[in-house]
Amino acid sequence: MPLFGWMKWPKNDSYKPTHYPGSDIVTKTLLRELKWHLKERERLIQEIENEQKVKKTGVDYNWLRNYQNPHTTIPVTEQRQLEVLCSQVQPCQTGTILSRFREVLAENDVLPWEIVYIFKQVLKDFLSSSDRGSEQEDLEDSGSMDCSAPSVIQGDSSKRADKDEIPTISSYVDKNTKDRFPVFSHRIWNLPYYHPSS
C-alpha cells in the first residue's frame, strides 16, 4: 500500500480558472504566438552572431555544427501565470492582444528573455483596461455578454470631439509603454547574446 495513497493530488488543470467558453483555445493560441516570437528572436540573434564571427575570422564554419543551441524556455511558474492571464481573455479579443504585442516588439529592440515580461505586461494592461470598460458598461446597465466594443459615455463624446487625432491601437500602446519600458526604448548598445551553460 503506498504511503500517500490516501491523499488526493490536484489535477494538472486545476490551476487554470476558465472564465470564458473557448478560453483553452485562446490560451493555446496566445502562448503559441509567444513561443514563436521567442524562437524567432533567438534565431535572429544567432544569425547576427554568426555573421559577426564570419566577418571577424573570414571563414564560415557554420556548416560544421550539428548541435542545437539551447532555446530560451519559459519557466513553469511563469507559464502558469501566463495561462491564468490568457484564460481571462475572450476569444474575440485575441487579435487585439496579438497586434499590441507584435507592435511593442516591432518598436523596441527586445532580447529573448525580455519577451515574456513584455507579453505579460500587454496582457495585464489589456485585462485592466477591459475591466475598466466593463465597469462602465455595468453602470449603463448593458447586460450583453458578447464581445462588443465598449460603448461611449455621453460625457466622453465632447472630450473626443476636441481631439484632432483618431485613437488607434498604436497610440494606446505608446501611451501605456512610455513609463513601463524605459529600458527597451532608450537602449543605445547591443550586447552579444549570452547562452548560459546548462
Swiss-Prot record:
Residues 157-166 have a biased composition (Basic and acidic residues). InterPro entries: RD3. Residues 28-57 form a coiled coil. Disulfide bonds: none annotated. Keywords: Coiled coil. The keyword Coiled coil applies. Residues 133-168 are annotated as: Disordered. PANTHER family: PROTEIN RD3-LIKE, RENTINAL DEGENERATION 3-LIKE. This is Protein RD3-like.
